[in-house]
Amino acid sequence: MDFSVSDNLDDPIEGVSDFSPTSWENGGYLDKVEPEIDKHGSMIPKYKIYTPGANERKFNNYMYMICYGFVEDVERSPESGKRKKIRTIAAYPLGVGKSTSHPQDLLEELCSLKVTVRRTAGATEKIVFGSSGPLHHLLPWKKILTGGSIFNAVKVCRNVDQIQLENQQSLRIFFLSITKLNDSGIYMIPRTMLEFRRNNAIAFNLLVYLKIDADLAKAGIQGSFDKDGTKVASFMLHLGNFVRRAGKYYSVEYCKRKIDRMKLQFSLGSIGGLSLHIKINGVISKRLFAQMGFQKNLCFSLMDINPWLNRLTWNNSCEISRVAAVLQPSVPREFMIYDDVFIDNTGKILKG
């Protein structure tokens, strides 16, 4: 692991280093589901199971489920025989449950439910899901299936503008994704920790490149080319900070040794659409370990990191092409983050 160091003298430290491809050789690829059409021209519902990580607890039966479907009009007169108009595609995250039911039974029961879809707004545009129908195999997910759920529209809907307000809409499920949670540890980093900033600290970030079996340009993603000439997309996530006392920064070599000793292993899952799972097999500093919640199995959902890129992976195969450690100065606390901007009638920008 060799770092290329920035030539910018204003940066106290900045370096990029690639991890070995062996760190994601097991679990670095998610295959897409090939669609099948029945004699009526409708897509046959399917399921797929993903088992990222080291599978330390193979029989704990905890799983994360997310289903995908067509948002279509609800016909007022079903006997008309007219085909329902498909508006867009949406993801319906069900969350974590513990079940010993066969995946096919889970899928069939999901498809038997009546799932309604409604567009609304809060701080952002929202999608509201509601469902009705008898539950047997899906009892571990009873709370979300009977109580309803609401999500940021950009995270779960491909084209929210196509969801009609004047007509009732329903979700016709065609795919169920099951991620087995067979490793001990947490499956989400607290958002407050992801936004944690510290003076005189070095931020430890990961830059992940993905090969996606899709036309990136058509999806509005420019991307870049890897060493084989294949177009790839990338996203960045934050793991923690290397903090030194007395107002000093750690050196590049020190951080390099710390990262090497962690022996990180990467794999892909389907939590929230696409998720990056990280396992720490080696030694980690106490401070960094505390920032990670004292867990050695971590998960980052692309739904939260980059929802636009996440939507592109819904029905396309995806593979890790490259993972790089990025060391950057942590953004100082003095830097203001403006979530809201107000402009008065004189054109002056006011602090939110």
Curated annotation (Swiss-Prot):
It holds the Pfam family Matrix_Paramyxo_N. GO terms for cellular component: host cell cytoplasm; host cell nucleus; virion component. The lineage of its organism: Viruses, Riboviria, Orthornavirae, Negarnaviricota, Haploviricotina. GO terms for molecular function: structural constituent of virion. Keywords: Host cytoplasm, Host nucleus, Host-virus interaction, Viral matrix protein, Virion. Homomultimer. Interacts with host ANP32B; this interaction promotes M nuclear localization. The keyword Hydrolase does not apply. Gene3D superfamilies: Viral matrix protein, C-terminal domain, Viral matrix protein, N-terminal domain. It is found in: Virion; Host cytoplasm; Host nucleus. It comes from Hendra virus (isolate Horse/Autralia/Hendra/1994). Residues 1-20 are annotated as: Disordered. InterPro entries: Matrix_C (IPR042539), Matrix_N (IPR042540), Matrix_Paramyxo_C (IPR055413), Matrix_Paramyxo_N (IPR000982). Plays a crucial role in virion assembly and budding. Forms a shell at the inner face of the plasma membrane. The gene is M. Its main location: virion. One of its GO terms (biological process) is virion assembly. Belongs to the morbillivirus/respirovirus/rubulavirus M protein family. This is Matrix protein.
